[in-house]
Amino acid sequence: MSMFGRKKRKPLRQLITHKEPKSRVTEQYRNIRTNIEFTSVDNHVRSIIVTSADPGDGKTTTIANLAVVFGQQGKKVLLIGADLRKPTIQNLFAIHSSNGLTNLLSGQAKLMQCIQKTDIENVHLMAAGPIPPNPAELLSSRGMDELLLEAYNMFDIILIDTPPVLAVTDAQILANKCDGIVLVVRSEKTEKDKIVKAKQILDKASGKLLGVVLNDKREGKEQYGYY
């Protein structure tokens, strides 16, 4: 999986792959997309969880920009906000929706009421919706399985933003429901033992780790490897 170069923090609404499509960072996102495609030559990967070991590692910004570069490739993308505890994915696309994943899984809304077209070509968003009292139970429900089955008929690729692996069980619950997982770590912040622990947890949950994205890489430093 590709490693990022160092990049300055951007406002949440600033999607660099959309705003600066010729930038070096955007090219790194395209490299990540290519690596994901290479991993799916024999086993077609259509649903991908993007998560992290800890909060603040950049998973949500990473998944949003991945959605953009897949959309730029002409693929119809569904981005699902499955971080039901601290949902922020909708902020990056400046979308405010009354319906989202929690409304769908709790039977309060239909699928098409919960999917919105973003301003970016080919990219659709299902926001998290209202914060529920039982996130893990909703994500492990039959409704989540049915959502994925329906989405496979409508979209080329499904990207799912989840809470950090070490914080709660949500990513583990979804791990074996999806085709692959991308783990985001932040350079000089995420501790090595936490990365190893996160991988062990995902392996135990029968998840397929596609690779690790190293975020905020400083030039001149030795690069991390990836799983």
Model-flagged regions — what are they?
Residues 1-227:
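P-loop NTP-binding module
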